[in-house]
Amino acid sequence: MWNTILFAVIPYLAVAIAVLGGIWRYRTDRFSYSSQSSQFLESRALFWGSVSWHYGILMILGAHVVALVLWNQWASLVSNPTRLYTLEVIGLALSLVAFLGLALLIARRLIVRRVAAVTTPMDLVLLIALATQVALGIWIALGYRWGSEWYVHTAVPWLHSLVKLNPKPEYMVSLPAIVKLHAVGGFLLIALF
């Protein structure tokens, strides 16, 4: 039952909340899609944190999407141990860069008084949720090696089943709890946006 809730109900619920909430926000408060600009209040930490965060996370998300869309090619790519090791090291490095950038952005929001003055509780909730998700990804990369390979045989078929509106939570059942939490956390982030 829990597997059905976590891997069949929550994903659809998260997407529904994101779509309906997005429409509602657009109609009621169009400026709620981003936090207030704080660039003029402090720009040095913003630059280093923002660049690190965006470059790191966009590359990591790109790899997740490429493996999801081109799963056969991805499986072939990581079947070679040298390429697998290389991708794993690059992925871990990028996730650390993203995490450090996000940590800098969070610290900036909390420490710089002028920036803290325009920080909303939702800004902090979102930043902490993002940091948690990246930290879980780092934990998985360090503790459950070769995610580039097993992702394509577990999470990808599960995500494909969701897209086909025929959820198959059994693909996720055998995965470690931390991986399950990372997968559910991804959908909770979708709901937050």
What is the predicted role of each segment?
Residues 11-15, 21-22, 37-193:
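Membrane-embedded alpha-helical bundles of multi-pass integral membrane proteins
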